[in-house]
């Protein structure tokens, strides 16, 4: 793969590209990376590349030098990327896609940015590495290059490690441990020491789910949404199997039994609910067992519900809010929503995607 970086400070990249894994990849011919100075295409005797923007403060990179720089190195197989907080977020999937390109051009902004006409004319896509502003786009370019390089065969000593790293399956990676078994009184989880590979795999998956749900709810709801046909269950301690009816039964510890029964009866439009057992309609065959525990600390449950269509989805959310529940984080497309009831039990509500 060939990568070219357009920047006002081409020397900025020298040290990172000589070091560590990227340096080895370049040395071994797996990557060819060159940084170029936009000032080489500046205007006039003084190679001017920036000017004051109309009706604004600061300085802006001019359209002509940027366009000339891009066209000078652009090929038929080139993909031009502008690093900007206005771009789409960098993800593992995007890194995989970029790793398949043969020639990438990274355009690094400086000052107040770049004249919009240059972007409209020459840029194929904009990528953001986060919701914050940097002193220059060079840092972002290095982040993207590092992320995509992991998916180029031969760059990593063990390509399998790239597939197992955090976020590659849509979830955060769980904790890792090495020797000694006990450090300052903290022990390595026993399951990792028993040699049961299936038990370890189950433990890692559960810890990964829990950590993602707690630390990155945005990733968690995206994970649930992207895996439409995969069952994602509540945590084991919150779920039991009904031997009589063979249905998924979830125990919800509540402060006020009457209040919670009224809330869920109205939410799911149940005409004659029993005192503490609510049968949720639909194909899920879920039964909620309400257990009154008063003001003591409750074990909160994590549940998911997929509705048949968009109208049902928004109707459900409207009822939830009207009845006193809280609406929390939504995914980027608004098709998945986290909600909570009076007692803090969390539901992931989504609807089926139209194929």
Curated annotation (Swiss-Prot):
| EC top class, as a word | transferase
Q: Per its record, what are the GO molecular function terms? A: tRNA (guanine(37)-N1)-methyltransferase activity
> Keyword Cytoplasm, does the record have it?
yes
Biological process GO annotation list? tRNA N1-guanine methylation
Q: What is its EC number?
A: 2.1.1.228
The subcellular localization recorded is: Cytoplasm
Principal place of residence: cytoplasm
The alphabetical list of record keywords is:
Cytoplasm, Methyltransferase, S-adenosyl-L-methionine, Transferase, tRNA processing
Transferase as UniProt keyword: yes
Q: Which residues bind S-adenosyl-L-methionine?
A: 109, 129-134
This protein's source sits in the domain of life called Bacteria
Swiss-Prot/TrEMBL catalytic activity = guanosine(37) in tRNA + S-adenosyl-L-methionine = N(1)-methylguanosine(37) in tRNA + S-adenosyl-L-homocysteine + H(+)
Q: Which GO terms describe its cellular component?
A: cytosol
- What PANTHER family does the record point to? TRNA (GUANINE-N(1)-)-METHYLTRANSFERASE (PTHR46417:SF1)
Q: Which family does it belong to?
A: Belongs to the RNA methyltransferase TrmD family.
Q: Which HAMAP family match?
A: TrmD (MF_00605)
Role played: Specifically methylates guanosine-37 in various tRNAs.
Which NCBIfam families does the record cross-reference, listed alphabetically? PRK00026.1, trmD
Q: How does it assemble?
A: Homodimer.
Q: What protein name does the entry list? A: tRNA (guanine-N(1)-)-methyltransferase
Underlying gene: trmD
